[in-house]
From Swiss-Prot:
GO cellular component terms, A-Z: chloroplast thylakoid membrane; cytochrome b6f complex
Its job: Component of the cytochrome b6-f complex, which mediates electron transfer between photosystem II (PSII) and photosystem I (PSI), cyclic electron flow around PSI, and state transitions. PetL is important for photoautotrophic growth as well as for electron transfer efficiency and stability of the cytochrome b6-f complex.
Keyword Chloroplast: yes
Entry-linked SUPFAM superfamilies: PetL subunit of the cytochrome b6f complex
Subunit-structure text: The 4 large subunits of the cytochrome b6-f complex are cytochrome b6, subunit IV (17 kDa polypeptide, PetD), cytochrome f and the Rieske protein, while the 4 small subunits are PetG, PetL, PetM and PetN. The complex functions as a dimer.
Protein name per UniProt: Cytochrome b6-f complex subunit 6
Length: 32
């Protein structure tokens, strides 16, 4: 069972990964 702290940490990790992937894709699209 996950605690609230680990759940929030996992949520922020997923959010950061999604934002990083999104900005990475936009940079690649601009280079094309």
């Amino acid at each position: 069972m996950l605690t609230i702290t680990s759940y929030v940490g996992l949520l922020f990790t997923a959010l950061g990964f999604t934002l990083g992937l999104y900005f990475g894709l936009t940079k690649v699209v601009k280079l094309i």
